[in-house]
């Protein structure tokens, strides 16, 4: 192993640097674990949820790969530390052998025999069996340590290509799955785009038509309400006029009745006066005169009441006529409002039909988009 030169201190320093790098990487992965494994959905729809789950799955796979890399890194650092310790022990054994040789050589040249230490070693087989045995044991131990280090280093380096290939395969699989899902999602979006565009255009046209119908319906309803108010006002005015007409008719009837009663009283008085005139200044004549005069007074009162009733009737008739005219006007306005309402309903009906059709197309587009999102999620899961 003369071609191999190892400095244990530098190997231990490199192991410590690698451990520090691993600590920094572990802290970085731990800090990124929360935002990358639990990605918050941008919205509450199915597509946003599926996209968030895709990126969350990528984050979890990255954490799994990080854990595997951390385990390999720790094992590699431990192997470096073990190798440095083994080389240090081997160098110590070599130094001990050199010291023994340096001490025993002068003793052999001066005394002709080994030093006391070598004599003790030769006389005590249980302690090592002599200098040659000790050096041979140290050499064998150093060879075994070097071989152990080489084996451990080879065993540590051997999994690197396969681990790198496995990591590349996992990354390629993740990228391929993401590309396939993205391609399917893009295809689904392209397929759903015409439906969505068509549905959006139909929605706009239908909304404009429906808004036109609503705009026409609003003044029609206002006209109906106003006509209803005018109709109620005219009805109230007509009812008031009819009430006054009824009251005037009652007064007129009372006046006619009083006139008839007064005429009867006057006729009775005149009859009595005529019958009493035969006997002028007779007691019967004297009694008949007040009766005849009372009938004339009652007749005058009845005539006055009759005139008042006719006056009241003449005052009420214009109100009745105005109420009937207002009632006719209100009826015409009400009929016009009903016609406007029917026209607005007819204009709004096609808009509502188009709106329903656009809603169906939009629902179909959403269905296509949902199917595409489910397919993308299925590919990611598989």
UniProtKB/Swiss-Prot annotation:
InterPro entries: PE-PGRS_N. This is Uncharacterized PE family protein PE23. The gene is PE23. Residues 1-92 form the PE domain. The chain crosses the membrane at residues 23-43, 155-175, 203-223, 230-250, 261-281, 284-304, 315-335, 347-367. The keyword NAD does not apply. It comes from the Bacteria. It comes from Mycobacterium bovis (strain ATCC BAA-935 / AF2122/97). GO terms for cellular component: plasma membrane. It is a multi-pass membrane protein.
């Amino acid at each position: 192993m003369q071609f191999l030169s190892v400095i244990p201190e530098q190997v231990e320093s490199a192991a410590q640097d690698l451990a520090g790098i691993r600590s920094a990487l572990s802290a970085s992965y731990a800090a990124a674990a929360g935002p990358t494994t639990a990605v918050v959905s941008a919205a509450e729809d199915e597509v946003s949820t599926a996209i968030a789950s895709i990126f969350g799955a990528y984050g979890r796979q990255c954490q799994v790969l990080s854990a595997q890399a951390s385990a390999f890194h720790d094992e590699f650092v431990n192997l470096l530390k073990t190798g440095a310790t083994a080389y240090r022990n081997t160098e110590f054994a070599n130094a001990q052998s050199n010291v023994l040789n340096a001490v025993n050589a002068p003793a052999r040249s001066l005394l002709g025999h080994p030093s006391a230490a070598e004599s003790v070693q030769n006389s005590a087989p249980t302690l090592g069996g002599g200098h040659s045995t000790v050096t041979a044991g140290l050499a064998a131990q150093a060879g075994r340590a070097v071989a152990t280090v080489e084996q451990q280093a080879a065993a540590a380096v051997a999994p690197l290509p396969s681990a790198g290939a496995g990591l590349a395969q996992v990354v390629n699989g993740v990228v391929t799955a993401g590309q396939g899902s993205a391609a399917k999602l893009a295809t689904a979006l392209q397929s759903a785009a015409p439906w969505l565009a068509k549905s959006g255009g139909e929605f706009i046209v239908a909304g404009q038509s429906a808004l036109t119908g609503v705009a026409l319906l609003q003044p029609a309803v206002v006209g109906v309400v106003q006509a209803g108010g005018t109709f109620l006002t005219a009805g109230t005015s007509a009812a008031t006029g009819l009430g006054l007409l009824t009251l005037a008719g009652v007064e007129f009837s009372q006046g006619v009745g009083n006139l008839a009663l007064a005429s009867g009283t006057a006729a009775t008085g005149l009859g009595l006066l005529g019958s009493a005139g035969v006997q002028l200044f007779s007691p019967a004549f004297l009694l008949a005169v007040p009766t005849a005069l009372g009938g004339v007074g009652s007749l005058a009162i009845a005539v006055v009441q009759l005139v008042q009733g006719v006056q009241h009737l003449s005052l009420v008739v214009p109100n009745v006529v105005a109420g009937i005219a207002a009632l006719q006007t209100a009826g015409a306005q009400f009929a016009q409002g009903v016609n406007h309402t029917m026209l607005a309903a007819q204009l709004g009906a096609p808009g509502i039909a188009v709106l329903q059709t656009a809603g169906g197309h939009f629902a179909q587009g959403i269905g296509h988009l949902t199917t595409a999102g489910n397919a993308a999620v299925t590919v990611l899961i598989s």
